[in-house]
């Protein structure tokens, strides 16, 4: 059994427990942010066949939220920001759907293009777990571009093929 397979159930249980999260020792966000940026830059620099989006998508599937409210709660606990999602629009099948994210990580970064590929992947993986359908999520507006919120466009894979 691989190391990750041995510890994953314990980690998954811990991230769902608010008390454990609140009591855990935390890496100060600027240090963790710098660490993550170095990893993200290195992945892009090396031209990895695995993109940040794909890594995020797998992470989102592992988080396996049961519903939209749990997804919002997980994002809040991870300090990824405040999600605005209208579950009814997704259920009504009127794509593309919009998800807004306030207070995301790295909002102090100034770039010409959106920077949250990893978060887009997390959203895709989580939505797949909730709705049992494949989604593609693309960040179309970002706070790094001077916008008030990040905006993600969500499409079902079936809709892409039409």
Curated annotation (Swiss-Prot):
Which organism's genome codes for this protein? Methanocaldococcus jannaschii (strain ATCC 43067 / DSM 2661 / JAL-1 / JCM 10045 / NBRC 100440) (Methanococcus jannaschii)
Q: PANTHER family, from UniProt? A: ARSR FAMILY TRANSCRIPTIONAL REGULATOR, DNA-DIRECTED RNA POLYMERASE SUBUNIT I
Name the Pfam families for this protein: V4R
State which residue ranges cross the membrane. Answer: none
- Which family does the record assign? Belongs to the M.jannaschii MJ0150/MJ0739/MJ0745/MJ1460/MJ1642 family.
Q: Name the chain's protein.
A: Uncharacterized protein MJ1460
So which domain of life are we looking at?
Archaea
Q: Which InterPro entries match?
A: NO_sig/Golgi_transp_ligand-bd, V4R
């Amino acid at each position: 059994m691989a190391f990750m397979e041995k510890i994953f159930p314990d980690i998954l249980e811990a991230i769902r427990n608010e008390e454990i999260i609140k009591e855990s020792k935390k890496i100060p966000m600027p240090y963790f942010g710098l660490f993550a940026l170095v990893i993200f830059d290195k992945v892009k620099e090396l031209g990895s066949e695995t993109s940040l989006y794909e890594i995020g998508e797998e992470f989102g599937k592992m988080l396996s939220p049961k519903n939209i409210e749990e997804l919002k709660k997980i994002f809040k606990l991870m300090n990824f920001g405040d999600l605005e999602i209208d579950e009814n629009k997704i259920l009504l099948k009127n794509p593309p759907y919009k998800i807004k994210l306030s207070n995301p990580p790295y909002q102090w970064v100034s770039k010409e293009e959106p920077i949250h590929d990893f978060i887009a992947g997390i959203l895709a993986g989580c939505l797949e777990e909730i709705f049992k359908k494949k989604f593609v999520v693309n960040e179309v507006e970002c706070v790094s571009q001077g916008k008030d919120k990040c905006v993600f466009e969500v499409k079902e894979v079936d809709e892409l093929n039409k």
